[in-house]
Amino acid sequence: AGQSEIRTGLESVKAQPGRLQVRAGARGACLIDDTYNANPASLKAAIRALANRPGRTVLVLGDMAELGPRAEDFHAAAGRQARDAGIDHLLTCGMLAGLTAEAFGKNACHFDSSQALIDSACQLLSPGLTVLVKGSRSAQMEVVADALICVSHDGAIAC
């Protein structure tokens, strides 16, 4: 295959839903939907991908499940990784994800419900902002990602 055919083939590849899928966010923001699942290694890769985006960045994180006795350590480490990578804001929801927000420090907020998280995230959305949403399947972070896209299921503006 020639370079032109390879280029055409690569341009036609689409991300699997919930796996670093870039979507148009409300208010001109860019949304990266990585809600399919989460573990420490995939979260580290997602943080790296978000940190490489231009402009301001927000990581929206739900709990990582099934991590065993080191679950708290993994969640706290994720907050430090995001902070050290230069992520601008961290929004979390879930019992363990609160430890992530605590370790991130300034510009992190933890919420008791996904709706409260959505309401806060909507206030941050603006052109040039990239938001990455991630969490284990049990955290149901796809609900958050869907709420932050341009158009809701009924056709209304989401935020």
Task: Describe the residue ranges of each PLM region.
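ATP-dependent carboxylate-amine ligase
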Residues: 1-159
